[in-house]
Amino acid sequence: MSYQKRLSFLFLLDSFIVLFSIFVGYEVLHPYTNFYTVPLLIISSITLLISHHIFAFSYSLYKKAWEYASVNELVAIVKAVTLSISVTALVQFIVEGNIYVRVLMLTWMFHILLIGGSRFSWRMFRDHYIRKTLNQKRTLIVGAGAAGTMVARQLLNNKESELIPVAFVDDDFKKRNLQFFGVTVVGNTKRIEKVVIEHQVEHIIIAMPSIKGKEIKRIYEECLKSKVKIQTMPMVEDIMTGKVSVNQFREVEVEDLLGRDPVQLDMESISKKIKGNTILVTGAGGSIGSEICRQVCKFQPKKILLLGHGENSIYQIDMELRNTYKDEFEIIPIIADVQDQKRILEIMELHRPDVVYHAAAHKHVPLMEYNPKEAVKNNVIGTKNVATAADVFGVRTFVLVSSDKAVNPTNVMGSTKRIAEMIIQELAKTSQTKFVAVRFGNVLGSRGSVIPLFKKQIQTGGPVTVTHPDMTRYFMTIPEASRLVMQAGALASGGEIFVLDMGEPVKIMDLAKNLIQLSGYTIEEIGIQFSGIRPGEKMYEELLGENEVHKDAVFPKIFIGKTTLQPREEIDYLIDHYLDMKEEELQGFVLGLANNKKVLERAVAN
């Protein structure tokens, strides 16, 4: 219905209600009286009619969408009616010196009941009849706090929503059996599976954006038992900043099931390192590198250099940052290979960065077993080139992105990352630059990680391939890993290897099961197949070796590990002679070097 038609309809309806109310009010007190023989009542009716329409326009009673009527709309009706009656009483007093108090009181009551009833009846009709005729999914809302009730209200008010809330669950005992917008709190989160059956629930929305850690993991696991579709609210900060609305639900991701409390950052110390400075990120097009760029830009650097050898990935992160930050600071995309020493020196000399985040590396374990020379070239020589250039041109802080696979490494990739750590620790002894490394476990969602592989296998009907039923890994999210890198740079005094307390390791088998269930399938439908441990893989991973001292946390959940350094000549020998070595010989050399074995004498003897 157009606004003009709506206005005409409500104007005529209200006119009838006004005249009917004053007539009935007088008739109740003075039955069988001829209404037209009482001049004051005619004057009062005209006054009430005119004043009602004036105040109705003043309080926008003709503009409101009454299908979404609530307490605010009722208050507006009461104000408009009360003021209309007050004006009528004033006119009666002026004309006759008397006020028909009882008539006006009855008129006031009928007026509010009929005006309010006419407006709210449409909402009741829509909620209880029209919505039932739609094909809507019965929805359970987990959490009856501010977020949960906001979700319920928006679902009830959105006539096009596919979801209709039928129940809440909440662990606050005081809310038990309370109703919010007509939806009852029927129990706590431990009853989710039973509530789903009792109320024929087809959809679950988890509306607890502030809850963290093991508690949210427990709630997700309770929801998974029900085998219905599960969604969750966006993050509170995203809602507050206007990035998303409260009803833009997202799928539950495996990252949500980690149950990890995020690391709280020292924003002030990070800001001092970044704001107004020139920042260089190598590997800027990769999963970790691109996220470091996003996080860095939040702190308003003077200039950010996006360095990488893949033009497509650099182009994508460049465009993303330009669209987000416009002309707030300078963004410079640089296509370069960290293996090209001359090019890296040119870049450092030209731009003179204050902070370098070195994320460029080969990270795929099985691939590097087959390509050890490429691993050395990129992870060892590439790191040496960037770190040496940083030293030469006075970079204040250099942060190496390392891996938990550098601890007691059993593969080429982990060994080259450990040797890269040794290189920057050696430089830290004499350089004015603060060199640090950051170790963390597997990053969920990064390119080449297990999650994208599992998702692809599920999409094709399975089975999901797991190397071993008992294999475990430490996991963290890409944003968390990137923030840790930035925090390490802020904490750096030189030569440290920072390690994150990553909580409990996760079984890959459990990860696969959770992902299958979150995708809406049963384990039996998709299946899990064991493929065996691949070359270079460990059953279990560590964050610190036995010979590394685990000190007290230097920051909440961040520790410093001390490592044993190898003689510099052994690393120099590797860099000078790796191209001449056979693959098996090179594999043995880097593994021995990374595990603090005397490899130089053996290599020279051969």
Language-model features: where?
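Signature of alpha-helical transmembrane segments in polytopic membrane proteins
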Residues: M1-L134, L163, T232
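Strand-loop microenvironment adjacent to phosphate/nucleotide-handling motifs in alpha/beta enzyme folds
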Residues: R6, Q264, S269-K273, E426-N442, ...
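A solvent-exposed beta-alpha-beta segment
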Residues: L19, F23, H30-Y32, F125-T232, ...
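NAD(P)-cofactor binding segment of oxidoreductase domains
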Residues: K217-M233, K303-G310, Y370-T397
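Flexible, Lys/Arg-rich cytosolic regulatory linkers and terminal tails that connect or flank
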Residues: Y220-T278, D391
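Conserved Rossmann-fold NAD(P)-dependent oxidoreductase catalytic core, especially the SDR/UDP-sugar
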Residues: G242, H358, H362-V365, E369-E421, ...
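N-terminal Rossmann NAD(P)H-binding glycine-rich loop of SDR-like oxidoreductase domains
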Residues: I279-F299
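Conserved Rossmann-fold cofactor-binding substructure of NAD(P)-dependent oxidoreductases
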Residues: I335-V355
